[in-house]
Amino acid sequence: VILDNQIQIAHNAIIGENTAIAGCTVVAGSAEIGKNCTIAGMVAINGHMKIHDGSVFTGMSMVTKPTKAAGVYSSGIPAQPNRDWHKMNAHIRKLPSVNAKIKQLEQEVAQLKSSAEDK
């Protein structure tokens, strides 16, 4: 086990062999972290969580429910599969243009309604 600085590990927590935990991470009571895991900085793991062997949590992830399988979980509350996080962020980057398109479509619908009412 490799532990960085400023880590809080509460009562009855279990940390599997070859697991690395970076600084400013908190592990609440009775959490169970598997073998060969990587926990990046500022991760918070709620109590009684089970983390599967080989799991990776990127920085600032908050683990609020047990993992269903090993994988890479990324930033956010709660932590989620990395692939889902990337998809969500791709959509977030498109929000300004999507919002502009919606406003344009709303104006077109309003004009069509107005034209239909005039007839």
Task: Please tell me what each predicted stretch does.
Residues 1-81:
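Structural signal for interior beta-strand "rungs" in well-ordered beta-sheet cores
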Residues 80-119:
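Long, leucine- and charge-enriched amphipathic alpha-helices
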